[in-house]
């Protein structure tokens, strides 16, 4: 797992989607860009929620700076996540969950 710092730039509640939407800046100077799995885990840890309820929808690295902009959604329940997120994002999220479960064993 790479070392990086997470800074919350903007945090807003979306009542229609029943989720919290976060704009993040990841600082990883002289380190590779963190994976979606690592970011989901770190955000869940920061907010004290289950990792399965956090979805990283966007990662955009800034060349040569060691900084990445990210967007994450934090849901109140898993059913809402399944209903609203696009298939591509859900697939990436499931791969992260499976990889973390395999690591735990």
Swiss-Prot record:
Give the CC-aspect GO terms: ribonucleoprotein complex; ribosome
Listed as disulfide-bonded, the cysteine pairs are none
* Membrane-spanning intervals of the chain: none
* Single GO molecular function: structural constituent of ribosome
The UniProt entry, under SUPFAM superfamilies, shows: Ribosomal proteins S24e, L23 and L15e
Q: What's the domain of life for this entry?
A: Archaea
Q: Which InterPro entries match?
A: eRP_eS24_sf, Ribosomal_eS24, Ribosomal_eS24_CS, Ribosomal_uL23/eL15/eS24_sf
BP GO terms, sorted:
translation
Q: Tell me the keywords, alphabetical order.
A: Ribonucleoprotein, Ribosomal protein
Q: Which HAMAP family match?
A: Ribosomal_eS24
What family does the Swiss-Prot or TrEMBL record give for this protein? Belongs to the eukaryotic ribosomal protein eS24 family.
Q: What is this protein called?
A: Small ribosomal subunit protein eS24
Q: What is the lineage of its organism?
A: Archaea, Thermoproteota, Thermoprotei, Desulfurococcales, Desulfurococcaceae
